[in-house]
Amino acid sequence: DQAEVKRVAESLEGQLTATLQMDDGDLDAARAHIQRGRALDPEDRYLRHLYADFLLAESRPDAAIDVLEDYVDQDGALLRLAIAAIDAGDRRADRWAQQFRDRMAAAQRSAEYAHLRELARFTLVVEDDPAEALALARANWRTQKEPADMHIYLAAARAAGEPGAADEVRTFIAEHGVQDSRLAPFLDNGTEAGS
């Protein structure tokens, strides 16, 4: 039906616009597009996760938990819940982290595609294992080259004390003219900021 097609198209447009505005650092505009998209389709998983990431970036972990806590059956929501709970000092952090670990282990045992970017983020932020996060980010980079993939690779390299390990990301950014405000803290004339 035409109304459904229009709603889906508007939701996808809102997702893309909000993502681009977050990349550009225009958080007010991103918030407006996320809210508009969520009004059109409150069950849109991508928008829900994008909104939670937005709230985490604004240091509002309790709000991120409120958005996600009814969706613990989704791996992406569970990852963000574990991160938000740690940031908020929420007692459920350990439980959500263990559930995410268990799911990733089950996916690896069953030879299902493990979401390496999400696993790298979890390993870096929740497990506090930069070396393993770097290995996962590197494996993810072989097939995924979105700004979020660049961010986790650069963050893991910095945290592992190996900024040069992410030189291939810097080269890719320079060659493709990637513009994303989230990457700026990791870049300074081709080197890690602060290194």
What are the functions of these language-model segments?
Residues 1-2, 26-38, 60-71, 91-105, ...:
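Alpha-helical repeat scaffolds
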Residues 123-124, 130-154:
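C-terminal hydrophobic structural anchor segments
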Residues 14-21, 33, 48-55:
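TPR/Sel1-like alpha-solenoid repeat signature
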